[in-house]
């Protein structure tokens, strides 16, 4: 703890007051965040800032440093990044060899590394690129021939640090002819990327194409880690046992009609100050 005195003299040159200034590390709670400390930083109208909503949109977010990345996934709009504290636009994300037309979504890991995923119908090539900065051209992390019988690329999640230990999950979207209860997962262990695993989830029914699909998010960085999902229009938050992939309802009341016209498919998990958090954003399905 360091302290010093500061004397302030008034405009009359006589009146004065001495203050003691101390530099110290504040006390920190041992678990999670302090309830009531939430602060709304900004509120943006997407149309006003040049990100209009269309039926082709499949939006996703990423965070790297103090940069908030917004990717519309519409095939035409270059992802942009904003000051995460003020909401002011800074610039467009450097994509390098990744084309806007192929880009499906973006996400980020616990260390601020960004993943960019391409769209892939059944039988086509699905790619994940990585970068450590919004201004550094991404490099290829992996390519996978999509043999799931479904579409991929609109929702990808990551838990952990892709340079050490992480779990990457790409949702398989439903199509016009088939619903989906599958995702593809990659496990990174000690910086080494493992083989893709196609996983079928038991007891969740079937989700559809965007915007009726789900983002599958996991608690940990192993193949046995439990995970969560929720999709329109059942809007049920499922907790899934990572060992047997059997689902249980985490919010049973959401299937009694109370969630009509809502779309509860925006979710993520994060660790903070020794606590694990699940975030579920409940939005209106109809404009």
Name these PLM-found stretches.
Residues 76-81, 121-130, 167-169, 173-189, ...:
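Structural motif
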Residues 83-120:
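Blade-loop segments of beta-propeller domains
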Residues 1-33:
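Beta-rich interaction/scaffold domains
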Residues 43-77:
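Beta-strand-rich domains and repeat architectures in extracellular enzymes and scaffolds
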Residues 50-61, 97-111, 143-163, 202-221, ...:
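Repeated scaffold domains used in trafficking and secretory/extracellular systems
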Residues 66-70, 112-116, 163-170, 222-228, ...:
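Entry beta-strands of beta-propeller and related beta-repeat scaffolds
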Residues 119-178:
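Asp-box/WD-like beta-propeller blade repeats and closely related beta-sheet repeat scaffolds
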Residues 30-48, 88-98, 135-148, 192-205, ...:
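Beta-propeller fold detector
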